């Protein structure tokens, strides 16, 4: 399952996150896969696409960073997957 993780850096300061990342890496538990990330320097946010079997694995990972950022974790589908599922539902009901 894919998730969009939105990190909001505490005090709008990404430096502590960067310093910990350099020391300790991403600190991901087994079963969590990092895909890509983008930084919004104006609003001090990071957007990450990650995969996991369920949201609980990601919540455990976010807890390791909670002293430096607030997290919003949103389950997402690719556009292709979403529209394919819509088509399947349409065919089943109709």
Which residues does each PLM region occupy?
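Short S/T/G/P-rich N-terminal loop/turn motif that feeds into the first structured element of a domain
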Residues: 1-35, 40-45, 53-57, 77-94
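Structural motif
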Residues: 32, 66-69
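Conserved catalytic core of Hanks-type protein kinase domains
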Residues: 51-52, 64
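Short, electropositive alpha-helical surface patch
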Residues: 57-65
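Conserved short beta-strand edge segments in small beta-sheet-based binding/regulatory domains
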Residues: 68-79
């Amino acid at each position: 399952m894919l998730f969009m993780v939105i990190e909001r850096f505490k005090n709008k300061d990404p430096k502590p996150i960067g310093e910990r990342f350099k020391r300790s890496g991403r600190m991901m538990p087994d079963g969590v896969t990092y895909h890509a990330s983008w930084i919004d320097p104006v609003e001090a946010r990071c957007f990450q696409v990650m995969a996991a079997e369920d949201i609980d694995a990601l919540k455990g990972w976010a807890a390791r960073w909670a002293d430096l950022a607030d997290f919003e974790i949103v389950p997402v589908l690719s556009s292709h997957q979403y529209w394919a599922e819509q088509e399947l539902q349409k065919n089943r009901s109709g």
